[in-house]
Amino acid sequence: MIADGSEDEEKWLAAGAAAFKQNAFYMQRAIDSNNLKDALKYSAQMLSELRTSKLSPHKYYDLYMRAFDELRKLEIFFMEETRRGCSVIELYELVQHAGNILPRLYLLCTAGSVYIKTKEAPAKEILKDLVEMCRGIQHPLRGLFLRSYLAQISRDKLPDIGSEYEGDADTVIDAVEFVLLNFTEMNKLWVRMQHQGPAREKERREKERGELRDLVGKNLHVLSQLEGVDLDMYRDTVLPRVLEQIVNCRDEIAQYYLIDCIIQVFPDEYHLQTLDVLLGACPQLQASVDIMTVLSRLMERLSNYAALNAEVLPYFLQVEAFSKLNNAIGKVIEAQEDMPILSAVTLYSSLLKFTLHVHPDRLDYADQVLGSCVKQLSGKGKIDDTRATKELVSLLSAPLEKYNDVVTALKLTNYPLVVEYLDTETKRIMATVIVRSIMKNNTLITTAEKVEALFELIKGIINDLDEPQGLEVDEDDFQEEQNSVALLIHMLYNDDPEEMFKIVNVLKKHFLTGGPKRLKFTIPPLVVSTLKLIRRLPVEGDNPFGKEASVTATKIFQFLNQIIEALPNVPSPDLAFRLYLQCAEAADKCDEEPIAYEFFTQAYILYEEEISDSKAQVTALQLIIGTLQRMQVFGVENRDTLTHKATGYAAKLLKKPDQCRAVYACSHLFWLEDRETIQDGERVLLCLKRALKIANSAQQVANTARGSTGSVTLFIEILNKYLYFYEKGVPQITVESVESLIKLIKNEESMPSDPSAESFFATTLEFMEFQKQKEGAIGERYQAIKV
């Protein structure tokens, strides 16, 4: 078997093939002339080429296949000879006169095949003789190929049920005995290869054994194809005998391959009914055997079997498949003390997937698997093996993918304990997977207890207190994570206000301790969710039992104030400013004047102390004016105070055009059409006159700075405000004041040089003409204006 090099091996193969071809030619010539003696002579010489020890398994196989093809011709010739009167018994004896044992046994197997076909003797006797005689070849390579030839030519002549060779003297038991004996001897030869030659060639020998393994495995395939091998025979005879040989050979390569062969070639039904026998052998295998892969494939096959055949599911419970697999995995891990953490996690991951497929309604089984995994991981600390971490994520993702419902996963008490063994980065990944599952399946989390459990699972993306120093998180990834948390908040919902208030309190607890950089993402949706809760509160008097509500608007507004207070420190004062105004509007609808005033006060403080950018001030002031205009809860004193502050802010804006627009916007604060108490025409007119004054000042500044009269757009905007209030019937806005302003605009020298202002003015005049065409009071009022 030892080759000096690939070139020498090619030469030996070429020389052997040439001699083989020459003898095959003379053998064929003897066959053609019906010369049995010469046919035997040249066939023996031809087969002598298989006695070489210089070829690798791959090259030897080439030579073997040439011999196989020629032996098929010789077998046909033997059959014809028996028809011409040659005694098959004499032929069987004659082939044994060959000088060398290897050619003799090949010829004996060929003659034995003919002997069985003639049915002149029981098939079991001939098969037993052949399999015993083959023990004469103990060279591993030559012996394996010889027995492979025996298995090949005999597989269609086994006394199986329904076979023509079945009879009173020949039963399927004889066929099974023959195949098992041949398998046992072949496995011994195959294992012996591992221990021949120097230690430095171990890798080469293992490679060669890998090339030869199918020769051994074919015996198990033959067994699986026998009609007579039913469940009883498989359980009582085949499986115990095969496992006995596998365990006793004590060879890592053989044990791994043959166990896998059993799983792959025999029916799933047989595996299900013999689980205890098959699994009982696993702890007895060598510690180096990759039992993880073997058991994973077994569980995968059983899972697929259950998925394709729903009617077999009761049998899984009947044979206690889960318990047997779980116990077997525990024993294997216990037997292999040095088993890598990856292997253990993979085994439990496969078991969990098996459980979810076969027993989806048994959450206790799934939780038991997770508990076993926790027990195995205990004392290991954070897992630093990348592949093991990936497998752990796969294990944790399995319940989410199966149930499409995080609520179900939350019922698994050991689930969060497994999450604890993930490192910080992987916890973030797992948290994202959980949140995406919730959003994809529109899963509502309806109790504070479940929300608390959920946030324990996803704390990797809502809490940065335990992140290691120096851990840099990509900003885009961070924003994406926090946006997903913001979306998640809207999936935490309960129609009962009391339970919903408990939920938002849980959110508050986690968000306020989650680190300042996350607050600008999480506080706004929390505020919105809480404001929705306020709208669902029962109106006073709706409770017929007179029971005092534990959740009141006052409590909720206090809660809102507490969470918004955290934002200016982030810093996100503009965000806090907007939220205060939203809360003020909500308080207005609840008729809570003191609370609404307090929220406005907080907004004003932020405007004065935190918002310094001129553009931001303009936007903020527009929000103040718009919100204050819609407020109906304030009494005269509070409203005057807030309105006075707003007009003061407007007059202090940096840019004159901004001042002008803010001041004329304040005019809306003094005239609300639907509220007679807020209809102060004098102050409306005062705001508009002040706006005209500021617009005039802005034009002078433009003239001084740029040498031009500046845009007339501000005057046209003010004209539109005059028209609005004139149409609403404000007494102080007279026809004369409107006509005077129109005349002022027409006299502006800058109008022709500013197409946009010219177009704006033309559109305003067209609007006035359109209003004149209307019937009723509005048409009459506009008719009075002479353009």
From Swiss-Prot:
It comes from the Eukaryota. Keywords: Acetylation, Cytoplasm, Endosome, Golgi apparatus, Membrane, Protein transport, Transport. It is found in: Cytoplasm; Endosome membrane; Prevacuolar compartment membrane; Golgi apparatus, trans-Golgi network membrane. One of its GO terms (cellular component) is endosome membrane. It is a peripheral membrane protein. It holds the Pfam family Vps35. One of its GO terms (biological process) is protein transport. The modification N-acetylmethionine is found at residue 1. Its main location: cytoplasm. Plays a role in vesicular protein sorting. Component of the membrane-associated retromer complex which is essential in endosome-to-Golgi retrograde transport. Also involved in the efficient sorting of seed storage proteins. Binds alone to endosomal membranes and is required for recruitment of VPS26 and VPS29 to membrane. The VPS29-VPS26-VPS35 subcomplex may be involved in recycling of specific cargos from endosome to the plasma membrane. Belongs to the VPS35 family. Component of the retromer complex which consists of VPS29 (MAG1), VPS26 (VPS26A or VPS26B), VPS35 (VPS35A or VPS35B or VPS35C), VPS5/17 (SNX1 or SNX2A or SNX2B). Component of a retromer subcomplex consisting of VPS29 (MAG1), VPS26 (VPS26A or VPS26B), VPS35 (VPS35A or VPS35B or VPS35C). Interacts with RABG3F. This is Vacuolar protein sorting-associated protein 35A. The lineage of its organism: Eukaryota, Viridiplantae, Streptophyta, Embryophyta, Tracheophyta.
